[in-house]
Amino acid sequence: MDYRHDLIIKLYDALIKNGFNVSEPDLYGLVTFDLICRRNDEKYIIKVLYNIDTFSRLSISSLMAMASVTKSSIIVIGEKSGSGRLEDGILYYRHHIPIMSFKTFIDYINGESPYIYSAPGGYYVSIDGDKMRRIRELKGYSVGYLSSKLGISRRSISLYESGSSATIDIYLKLEETLGEDLTKDIDIRNEKYDYNIKDDIKDVFIRETFQMLSALGYSYEYIKKSPFDGFSYDPETMFMLGIFNNYMENERIISIKKISQVLNNIPLIIQKEYTEKENIYGCPVVSISELRSMGSMYAFKKLVEKRYSYD
């Protein structure tokens, strides 16, 4: 029984029911991620793992680059780790990427954000520091009084009021003493992705294509182990690129088209060999010789717009 595949299908169905536009499961060429979904301004790049301990650092640079460029959030959905099943309502991390159980994620997209996370040393509660300070002052408690009552340092109280998290046992004492819920929801959409290591582009043709697009004024990000090869973009336009060295794989082009529809990007096929086809499955096709002859970004955009099918 393929538990991971079953979980992907289960997640796909749940996202559809919750109003998301979702890329289809089982699309050709998926390795780095499993699903991409969008609902209004919410965009998630999802990796599904049965055991989260198998999450490798190898795909992180591509995930982070993709999230940064498309303004999406990365989330790993898992069932278990080496220490047991993932607990519902708890946020986990691997390599700075947030991880949740299926139920926790469904609760999250329905407005119930987790406020407890797992980290070295146990579970921690995210505290609303401003609220804690306000309630302490309303009750007339000094920092010294509260620290003495809880048996912790004054510095710890100051840290909590500055937004630091507390262990569950300390948090429960705080809540009991102040008589208020002090938890603060954790919004994974606020995660910042710092990826300093870019994947080397080993394919000479792909590297040459990006260099030519860069010469026209486009920025780019290479994405490995996905149906598309990366993104090329300026402030107004973003292309999802499929770069084909020889023959064009129909299944891969269909995958690029469907994923681009979710992210609202323009799917663009760059072909090494000249072809009379200007559009395949709704994706504009440009040969490398045509790209090489482009004298400006404006001319290139006009060529792509002419060949782009919006249906």
UniProtKB/Swiss-Prot annotation:
- Pfam families, A to Z: HTH_3
> Disulfide bond among the record's keywords?
no
Q: InterPro entries, from UniProt?
A: Arc_TR_HTH (IPR020886), Cro/C1-type_HTH (IPR001387), Lambda_DNA-bd_dom_sf (IPR010982)
Which regions of the protein are recorded as binding DNA? 143-162
Keywords attached to this Swiss-Prot or TrEMBL record, sorted alphabetically, are: DNA-binding, Transcription, Transcription regulation
**HTH cro/C1-type domain: from which residue to which, for each copy?**
132-186
**SMART domains (UniProt xref):** HTH_XRE (SM00530)
Q: What molecular functions are annotated in GO for this chain?
A: DNA binding; DNA-binding transcription factor activity
Top-level taxon of origin: Archaea
**This protein is called what?**
Putative HTH-type transcriptional regulatory protein PTO0557
Give the organism, scientific name. Answer: Picrophilus torridus (strain ATCC 700027 / DSM 9790 / JCM 10055 / NBRC 100828 / KAW 2/3)
**Which lineage?**
Archaea, Methanobacteriati, Thermoplasmatota, Thermoplasmata, Thermoplasmatales
